[in-house]
């Protein structure tokens, strides 16, 4: 018996009117390669199997609540331009209505996961107590909407950078009372994450760094940050939470230099303080670009360390030098991302979070769908091409050939430590390696072209029938 997709209307979400009338009640679906309809996928077909697994399982997409629902497209030169009919007064009533709109958006867009900061979902109120009371009030609605839709929480986090008290940092700040507030927010979100079934819990140290070295006690700040994370680990264990802890590296902005600069720096810090086994990395494309690294570098480091825990799917504006959070629109970047993800066996319980926003000129509600649809299609192109490369095996064969000399007696002797230093040096004296005979060309350009070729061929023969993901099917 064929499984039937569930049909939900805006009324099922408790909304009085449709916030997205331009969709005419029709969710975004796959309509075939080359489709030019702005509210349809031309490459992302969620239920289609790639390498034996549905596409939506390879690409666990998540909506970023802060950009999608709260972002008004303001910048340092002017106020927001975004037209968001659901944005009203900063009240609990409006917060609840906004949440209903958010879940309706995800349902219509076909996004299975969502991610949020504590300050995204409710007003702060007059103090921390009121803030946390507001969170307690909205949690039942979160559970109700998750049950209605099958949408799950990819990760929760705490905003420890926006409140004025965090101007000098949170866990690395100069005042213990600020540290205490930061930990109270973190503890609360650990509790919330457990209640709503969050898969992960992200730590991003937006102001955990410095702006002036002249005034810095580096050792004190590093110890305080380590203690903060250690206490989070302890509290997670105390309450029996199962979330995976993730740290999101970023080199700068808003501080001059942040302590979670890149994945290798994060690993060194975690290992120094005995925390490496408790955390993985949430790698953002734009953040990697800010440290002048391609995102596949950061992904490869994380994967090699066994610490690839999630991805923020966006990209920067080349040459700008700041975190512009554009939607991913370059299929070749997507391809390099997916090569690493497939080689890693996926993201485990991690998600690909659309930490991205429309441009200031793209201010209408429909632009939220246009941008997410384009980003999801871009990743799908990357997945299809990466899968084709994996099936053909040419890159794997080239890598095996490249490092084959390490399978020789000399290579094994060095790697295993079984060859004495004198014997190693005698081997060096006995043979002078020559380019072309002992050391072959790597043919790098030809291997780069394999990616172009795969992107050209990956959609040949793809059928145009939409296949629903199981999470959207009727019981």
Give a label for each model feature.
Residues 2-16, 22, 47-50, 97-101, ...:
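Active-site acidic/histidine proton-transfer and metal-coordination neighborhood
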Residues 73-97, 216-222, 256-268, 279-280, ...:
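Gly/Pro-rich active-site loop or hairpin
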Residues 2-85:
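N-terminal basic, low-complexity leaders that serve as flexible interaction/assembly modules and, when applicable
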Residues 306, 320-473:
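Flexible, acidic glycine-rich loops studded with aromatic residues
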